[in-house]
Amino acid sequence: MSASSPAERRQRAQQLPPLRAEDDQAIQRFLDRLWAEQGVARQTLDSYRRDLEGLARWRDGAGGGLQGADRSALFDYLRWRTEARYAPRSNARLLSTLRGFYALCLRDGVRSDDPTALLDPPRLPRSLPKALTESQIDALLAAPEIGTPLGLRDRAMLELMYAAGLRVSELVTLPAVAINLRQGVLRVTGKGSKERLVPLGEESQHWLERYLETARPTLSERKAVPAVDGQVPLFIDAARRPLSRQQFWGLVKRYAAVAGIDPDTVSPHGLRHSFATHLLNHGADLRALQMLLGHSSLSTTQIYTLVARQHLQTLHARHHPRG
């Protein structure tokens, strides 16, 4: 059974009742604690809010609302989402959000039990990261029309994402001060507010310099760019605002079509996968790759070794006389 489309999910969300004030307050307290105690990124907090609002609206105040939900109610909600064709990975993330929320309720004495304790996460199929070929990457990066300020910005963004292996949330929220062109490095604040230094590479540094020298001043009309969360964004639109993840997603799809690549096979995260896969194919060390990607666990990085192994097997089958 295939996962539901974004349009189908929006339609289902519109059919649910509005959020109750008590549930909204409980959700906001949870998010405020995460931000204050763990420094969770804004995009992650937005995802948690959507997860909790979905459950709260589905329950519509039954049995004490969101904070009063029991194991049976949570099981019914997960079953409803499964029948509504939400992807297993989406349901797994929801359960992770619920575990955090009810752990806080338990800690604060709002309730005396954890209704998620005996809930099993959905089984996730093991899927290998999908990487573009190096020739496809070349075509994709060359797709923007660099004769325009927006096209030059897009070229710089694509080059940087592939050169540094950034997450899309890291790219669109990147502050201008994170770039050090003189030293050729980028300071990235990743998940859990962990910082890492990533080399830029000659190509991405070249396009960043061109963007900063010509395109960005034109887009900002040579006015000061407003700060967001206390920092001035590096990449901006014609209204001097940072791009959203959805905007960049649309740009990647559009340029994939220009490059002659099926847009359905390309995503911003695919550039990060390509970065990792191509480095391994060219002999990069797994520990070094872990540091560049900002993975807290080496096991997360090791999945790329399977992709690299597949690449070697394909080369062997294609070129060895007895392959």
From Swiss-Prot:
The keyword Amino-acid biosynthesis does not apply. One of its GO terms (biological process) is resolution of DNA recombination intermediates. GO terms for cellular component: cytoplasm; Holliday junction resolvase complex. It is found in: Cytoplasm. InterPro entries: CB, DNA_brk_join_enz, Integrase-like_cat_sf, Integrase_catalytic, Integrase_recombinase_N, Integrase_SAM-like_N, Recomb_XerD, Tyrosine_recombinase_XerC/XerD. Residues 21-106 form the Core-binding (CB) domain. CDD domains: INT_XerDC_C (cd00798). The active site is at R167, K191, H269, R272, H295, Y304 (o-(3'-phospho-dna)-tyrosine intermediate). GO terms for molecular function: DNA binding; tyrosine-based site-specific recombinase activity. Pfam families: Phage_int_SAM_1, Phage_integrase. Residues 127-317 form the Tyr recombinase domain. Its main location: cytoplasm. Keywords: Cell cycle, Cell division, Chromosome partition, Cytoplasm, DNA integration, DNA recombination, DNA-binding. Site-specific tyrosine recombinase, which acts by catalyzing the cutting and rejoining of the recombining DNA molecules. The XerC-XerD complex is essential to convert dimers of the bacterial chromosome into monomers to permit their segregation at cell division. It also contributes to the segregational stability of plasmids. Forms a cyclic heterotetrameric complex composed of two molecules of XerC and two molecules of XerD. Belongs to the 'phage' integrase family. XerD subfamily. This is Tyrosine recombinase XerD. The lineage of its organism: Bacteria, Pseudomonadati, Pseudomonadota, Gammaproteobacteria, Lysobacterales.
